[in-house]
């Protein structure tokens, strides 16, 4: 098995939002993008606070990826659901094969009308990158930008290329090597 590891150079690059930053105090950013979320092919949320706030709008994400933490502190979001729930290991600063597989499988189920929630043991901070790669065009991926707002990524061919380039800049670590 293997995983992708964040490099110091890429960490700096990822400080910039991958999509459009919608600023404001909760719930303002979510109310501003509500119609866009309702029109999206799939809504993907990355993070506990983002998932919780999208659910409060009455929108159930096709795919939700969360780790029961916010700003490195334990957090118990109000995310009770009838979704298919998968649990994966994903250490901080990495994208594991298990996370990639869960996201890919999640979209397969979402395309058949199921809601899928991926509970990450570790950290889900980088999950937006593979979520964009596996999401069908016309989907929207949301993640939080702490103390600033929420980032909305419209999944397009250009956006997929950008995320593919980001993945290619990560260090590939073979587990057990």
UniProtKB/Swiss-Prot annotation:
Swiss-Prot/TrEMBL keywords: Coenzyme A biosynthesis, GTP-binding, Kinase, Nucleotide-binding, Transferase
Pfam families tied to this protein: DUF359 (PF04019)
Keyword Nucleotide-binding: yes
MF GO annotations: GTP binding; kinase activity
Cross-referenced InterPro entries: deph_CoA_kin_Thcocales (IPR054930), GTP-dep_dephospho-CoA_kin (IPR007164)
Pathway: Cofactor biosynthesis; coenzyme A biosynthesis
GO process terms (BP): coenzyme A biosynthetic process
Binding site for GTP: 48-50, 67, 69, 124, 147
Enzyme class: transferase
Annotated catalysed reactions: 3'-dephospho-CoA + GTP = GDP + CoA + H(+)
Known EC number: 2.7.1.237
UniProt key word GTP-binding: yes
Similarity annotation: Belongs to the GTP-dependent DPCK family.
Function in brief: Catalyzes the GTP-dependent phosphorylation of the 3'-hydroxyl group of dephosphocoenzyme A to form coenzyme A (CoA).
HAMAP family tied to this protein: Dephospho_CoA_kinase_GTP_dep
Protein name (Swiss-Prot/TrEMBL): GTP-dependent dephospho-CoA kinase
Organism: Thermococcus onnurineus (strain NA1)
Lineage of the species this protein comes from: Archaea, Methanobacteriati, Methanobacteriota, Thermococci, Thermococcales
